[in-house]
Amino acid sequence: MKLLTVKFGEKYSSQLVNKFLNYGEVYCYTDNANGLSRDITIIEPLGNKYKIPYFYKIDLFSPQMPNEQFLYLDLDVNIYGDLHKLIREEFTVPYAYWRSKSEMTKYTRTMLNTGVMSWYNKPVEIYEYLINNKKEVLTFWPGIDPFIEKMLFDYNVYEEHLIGFEGSWNVKPIIELRKKDERK
């Protein structure tokens, strides 16, 4: 299984990337490989600059990136089960079952969460739209979750019990997304 993650800037440590070696072959798209295990395949930056770091995830859909079966994981996820159950050929993301729909606003909140994604056929159209409309996208959209959902790109969603948000689940999920204030 090929795991893919993104590490830009100093927010997250190399140890968070290295922990994924326990689960499969690891690829890391990063601007700083210091401290990463030699067993991790480093993907060099494409040269795009984003004020909002989350947008570096969209570079993963560039035609220049490897077109292989990947399971993408944010660095701060907790893993409790068999990651193979999350592998999908079509672009798949979690639906945020744990969020109240009353939290949604037109632009800033979404029912998607890109903390976990899987694909074989990467959604190049998402990357191309961003590159061709960069000023609009980076001005208008506060993150990639609402951008992907509101722009109506094609995606599938995981079944509810597979991915949960910390403290929101009754049955232990395979992946647990952590609260922002606990990400280190």
Language-model segments: residues:
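N-terminal anchoring/stem segment of glycosyltransferases
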Residues: 1-52, 65-66, 121
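Short, polar loop motifs at secondary-structure junctions
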Residues: 27-36, 75-83, 163-166
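Glycine-rich, basic loop-to-helix element that forms the pyrophosphate-binding segment
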Residues: 53-60
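A conserved catalytic-core signature of glycosyltransferases
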Residues: 56, 112-114, 143
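Short amphipathic alpha-helix with an adjacent loop that forms part of the alpha/beta core around
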Residues: 62-64, 86
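Short aromatic/hydrophobic "clamp" motif used to bind/position activated sugar donors
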Residues: 70
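Conserved donor-nucleotide/metal-binding helix-loop-beta segment in metal-dependent transferases, i.e.
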Residues: 78-111
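Catalytic core and acceptor-binding pocket of nucleotide-sugar-dependent glycosyltransferases
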Residues: 116-184
